[in-house]
Amino acid sequence: MSYSTRSISQSARFGVLASPGVNRARSVAGGASTVRMSSANVTSSAFGGSSAFAGSSAFAGSPAFNVSVTSNNGKETMQNLNDRLANYLDRVRSLEQANHELELKIREYLDKKAAVGSLDYSGYYNTINLLRSQINDATIDNTRLVLSIDNAKLAADDFKIKYESEMAIRTGAESDIVGLRRVLDELTLNKTDLELEIESLKEELIYLKKNHEEELAVVRSSARGNVDVQVDSAPPVDLAQIMADVRSQYESMMEKNRQELEACYKGQSENLNHEVATNTAALQTSKTAITDLKRTIQSLEIELQSLLSMKGALEGTLAETEAQYGAQLNHLQAMITQVEMELQNLRSDADHQSLEYKRLLDAKTRLEMEIATYRRLLEGEDTRFSQTETQKAVTIVSKEQSSSSIKKVKTVIEEVVDGKVVSSRVEELTETS
């Protein structure tokens, strides 16, 4: 909505003024009883055209007015308005051109982005899924190998405990064998002593036999002589019988000792042989178990080394794969960030251009409304001006017949909506001097 205001006052000036929304019409003043008036021809052009006033208006009486000054002011005002309109239109055209170029850039960018977004990444996705499945399989195998290693370690610990227990049993058996060997040595020494004692007894027996035979020989040789000696003495002692008794006693003692020694030796030997056989079997079993355990430990160590090497290779492959895809992901992330920044800049530029375009469009709309109002005022000014001048001339003549000076100011306010006059009212101000 815009308002145009026309004021008509009795002054010494005649001019045309224009402002946004408010337009002031010509003002006419007369100081004589006779008024002479000529119409003014107005030629106007909108949107970069030119406007000029042609015509003259003269008043007879005092004071006189120079209408050419008013005409020049109107021309300058219209020229300024036309220049401003031309500048606004040029700026609007340049901004429209820039907006069009920016829209083309945005469209090209969106087309390029759509073309990039429409690329087929199925091959990459398949490769990624394949690598993920391989990584999962390697992880499962690694976990399985870790479990196998743990089980092997537990089995090795069990075998180690068994080995230690068998070694303790073996050590006990060896210590028992050493003790039995000591007992055997003692028995051997006792046997040797007894054998030596038997030998000494045998030698003593031989010596006694020899002495007995010598004594018998002496007795027999003395008995062959014819010497008859009668001695009243105790009956003679039978030495042979005594020797035989002694021999039999010693032989019985020797036989008894020999039998006891043989029985003791046989019992201890049998016990020792039984213990040695038992311990030998246990030792052989322990040696066999130790050999099996060593073989098992060696095979498990070999398997552990192979699993550790496989684990290291898989970890290296996994690290290389993660590094490669991490680098690709970082590159893609950087590209996405750059594209987002470019898109944000384009959006900000587009928003700025849109705001500038709206501002200039509003200015253009207001200017077009002012031009339309100004054109409408110029087109309808002649008729209103002629009617108003006629009425004012009559009023002025009637007032000049009296001796007083009256100054009247009439203001015409028009309400314009979308280039159409909706309502109009007149305000009149009278001053008496």
UniProtKB/Swiss-Prot annotation:
Region (Linker 1): 110-127
GO BP: epithelial cell differentiation; intermediate filament organization
SMART domains given in the database record: Filament
One of the record's GO molecular function terms: structural molecule activity
PROSITE patterns referenced in this protein's UniProt entry, alphabetically: IF_ROD_1, IF_ROD_2
Keywords for this protein: Coiled coil, Intermediate filament, Keratin
Superkingdom assignment: Eukaryota
Domain IF rod: start-end pairs: 74-385
Any GO CC annotation of this UniProt entry: intermediate filament
Region annotated Tail, chain positions: 382-433
UniProt miscellaneous comment: There are two types of cytoskeletal and microfibrillar keratin: I (acidic; 40-55 kDa) and II (neutral to basic; 56-70 kDa).
Protein name in the entry: Keratin, type I cytoskeletal 47 kDa
Record organism: Xenopus laevis
Gene: xk70a
